[in-house]
Amino acid sequence: MSSCSRTRLSRALGVPLTPKAARLMEVRPYPPGQHGRFRRKGDSDYAVRLREKQRLRGQYGLREKQLASVYHEARRVKGLAGENLVEMLEMRLDALVLRAAFARSISQARQLVVHRHILVDGKLVDRPSYSVSPGQTVKVKPKSVPLDPFQVAASGGHADVLPPIPGYIEADLEGLSFRLVRRPKRSEVPVTCNVQLVVEYYAAR
């Protein structure tokens, strides 16, 4: 997806998906289109749930099939489906690379993984959907450390566009490594979404 498309999607969903989108939404905090400034009236329950599902999907950069698959897995686990869903999404390797401030956006985090720059417990992992377990250590491959994106990360260059590193991650930015110390709690995860509406969306299908 192009930068322009992500910015337009950010405005439509009401959540910034990239740093560029965040800057634009400060100036235009309403959906794109001629009638964007006006509040949408008469949205059906389905439309509200659909929009919330799209917000969650957009923040993790997933295709519909991917999000639906994680939801069905979350339902099979003991506990609340919505909380399980966010926890599972947050433990994806690409999501954690973003949360640890190694990247500026979820799309960049995914590229870093796919391009084989990331090690988990010393082994190369190139699957963004890889589920990191508590106690595992993630670091940048030594040969990749000199690359510009990682030098920016090591200097704390993404701090201006990202929320603080959450408590479930123990990060060493200078060393370009981090450890998932425990499973994340929904209240700690910096995503904007009413997860219950997402659960209701899938439950009604």
Swiss-Prot record:
Pfam families: Ribosomal_S4, S4. Disulfide bonds: none annotated. Residues 91-149 form the S4 RNA-binding domain. PROSITE patterns: RIBOSOMAL_S4, S4. One of its GO terms (cellular component) is small ribosomal subunit. It comes from the Bacteria. GO terms for molecular function: rRNA binding; structural constituent of ribosome. Keywords: Ribonucleoprotein, Ribosomal protein, RNA-binding, rRNA-binding. SUPFAM superfamilies: Alpha-L RNA-binding motif. Part of the 30S ribosomal subunit. Contacts protein S5. The interaction surface between S4 and S5 is involved in control of translational fidelity. Belongs to the universal ribosomal protein uS4 family. One of the primary rRNA binding proteins, it binds directly to 16S rRNA where it nucleates assembly of the body of the 30S subunit. This is Small ribosomal subunit protein uS4.
